[in-house]
Amino acid sequence: MTEAKKSLKRTLIGKVVSDKRAKTVTVMVERRVKHPIYDKIMIKSSKYHAHDEQGEYKLGDVVEITESRPLSKTKNWVATRLVQKAALV
């Protein structure tokens, strides 16, 4: 039986908040969690540095990032695809 292997790498979707570094974008991923005592839904966010080889992702784009081997001290993710282009203001 040949079954497709399920990828063990995590994927997240977030918004590019910085594209100033060479070949790197900073992606903010927001998630909703319920407060354990007050039962209020809160939004928590985390920032990840992701590798962007061609420099194709710009500020405000929504991108998908995939976990990878460590590429530098803080960079363990790779930007894999563009989900939504940033709207022009």
Curated annotation (Swiss-Prot):
SUPFAM superfamilies (UniProt xref): Nucleic acid-binding proteins
UniProt-recorded Gene Ontology molecular function terms: rRNA binding; structural constituent of ribosome
A GO CC term assigned to this protein in UniProt: cytosolic small ribosomal subunit
Keyword presence, rRNA-binding: yes
One Pfam family cited in the UniProt record for this chain: Ribosomal_S17
Disulfide bonds: none
UniProt keyword Ribonucleoprotein, yes or no: yes
UniProt entry keywords in alphabetical sequence: Ribonucleoprotein, Ribosomal protein, RNA-binding, rRNA-binding
GO biological processes: translation
Protein task: One of the primary rRNA binding proteins, it binds specifically to the 5'-end of 16S ribosomal RNA.
HAMAP family per UniProt: Ribosomal_uS17_B
Family to which this protein belongs: Belongs to the universal ribosomal protein uS17 family.
Quaternary assembly: Part of the 30S ribosomal subunit.
Protein name: Small ribosomal subunit protein uS17
Gene source species: Delftia acidovorans (strain DSM 14801 / SPH-1)
Lineage: Bacteria, Pseudomonadati, Pseudomonadota, Betaproteobacteria, Burkholderiales
